[in-house]
Amino acid sequence: MGFRAFLVEKTGVGFERSIVERSESDLPEGELLISVKFSSMNYKDGLSATGNPGVTRNYPHTPGIDASGIVLESSHPDFDNGDEVIVIGFDLGMGTPGGFAERIRIPANWAVKCPPGLTLSLIHI
């Protein structure tokens, strides 16, 4: 299935940024496929989006070091399809395509279920 992602690409003279159509086959291996509902912009994402080599070394790249969303596919016993989850840190948005996309695929140990009383949008405030 296709989805949109913010992509930073290295060119001969700098970096280009655009919204592109991606395929789930473009995503890395992982136990959870997540439909991203929210992600926040922070300092590290800004550095990554401008091509800072101290933050991102592999291109093309999708920034976004955090994301919250709904599990679409799970091969891990602790998560079910439909679970609301939060992902912050690890390699997300650094070496692994990040939250500035409509889909991410990650190892299950990067995710936590959204606690009762907290919404996916409030996590990023």
Task: Please place each PLM-identified region on the residue numbering.
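Cytochrome P450 core scaffold surrounding the K-helix E-X-X-R motif
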Residues: K44-G46
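A structural motif shared across PLP-dependent enzymes of the aminotransferase-like
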Residues: G93-A108
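Conserved hydrophobic/aromatic beta-strand scaffold that supports enzyme active sites
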Residues: R17-I19, S68-I70, E84, R103-R105, ...
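Short glycine/threonine/proline-enriched tight-turn/helix- or strand-capping micro-motif at secondary-structure
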Residues: V13-S23, N52
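Glycine-rich beta-strand-centered segment in the early N-terminal region that forms part
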Residues: S25-M41, N52-L92, G98
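Glycine/charged-rich beta-loop-alpha catalytic/anionic-binding loops adjacent to active sites
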Residues: A108-S121
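Short structural boundary motif marking the start of a folded domain
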Residues: M1-F6, L32
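Conserved small/polar residues in nucleotide/adenosyl-binding loops
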Residues: I123-I125
